[in-house]
Amino acid sequence: MSRISKEQVKHVAHLARLAITEEEAETFRNQLEDIITAAEQLNEVDTEGVVPTTHVLQMHNVLREDKPEKGLEVKEVLKNAPDHEDGQIRVPSVF
């Protein structure tokens, strides 16, 4: 017996505002059936003694520590800006 019907597939397609044919509904039903079967096989895997994890690799932040450092002076920044006014960098209008 099928765990998902063609009508359920058509209903979900309707909710997603997708127009699908009868043939597509049957194709998707078969594909979903295969996906459910594959997911159910995971329940059969023996996980006794396996520590539950939230990540595949037990890596922590491998980046350097954030340390505040003194940046450029405003004068230096404005010296490299193509256009500025009143201590602000002027950029082309976006809107």
UniProtKB/Swiss-Prot annotation:
EC class, as a word, reads: ligase
Q: Which reaction does it catalyse?
A: L-glutamyl-tRNA(Gln) + L-glutamine + ATP + H2O = L-glutaminyl-tRNA(Gln) + L-glutamate + ADP + phosphate + H(+); L-aspartyl-tRNA(Asn) + L-glutamine + ATP + H2O = L-asparaginyl-tRNA(Asn) + L-glutamate + ADP + phosphate + 2 H(+)
Query: A single GO molecular function, which one?
Result: ATP binding
Question: Looking at the record's lineage, which domain of life comes first?
Answer: Bacteria
Q: What InterPro entries is this protein classified in?
A: Asp/Glu-ADT_sf_sub_c (IPR036113), GatC (IPR003837)
**UniProt record, GO biological process:** glutaminyl-tRNAGln biosynthesis via transamidation; regulation of translational fidelity; translation
What Pfam families does the record tag this protein with?
GatC (PF02686)
For this protein, the record's SUPFAM superfamilies field holds: Glu-tRNAGln amidotransferase C subunit (SSF141000)
Q: What is its EC number?
A: 6.3.5.-
Q: Which UniProt keywords apply?
A: ATP-binding, Ligase, Nucleotide-binding, Protein biosynthesis
Quaternary structure (record): Heterotrimer of A, B and C subunits.
Which family, according to UniProt? Answer: Belongs to the GatC family.
Task: Tell me the function of this protein.
Answer: Allows the formation of correctly charged Asn-tRNA(Asn) or Gln-tRNA(Gln) through the transamidation of misacylated Asp-tRNA(Asn) or Glu-tRNA(Gln) in organisms which lack either or both of asparaginyl-tRNA or glutaminyl-tRNA synthetases. The reaction takes place in the presence of glutamine and ATP through an activated phospho-Asp-tRNA(Asn) or phospho-Glu-tRNA(Gln).
Would you tell me the protein name for this molecule? Aspartyl/glutamyl-tRNA(Asn/Gln) amidotransferase subunit C
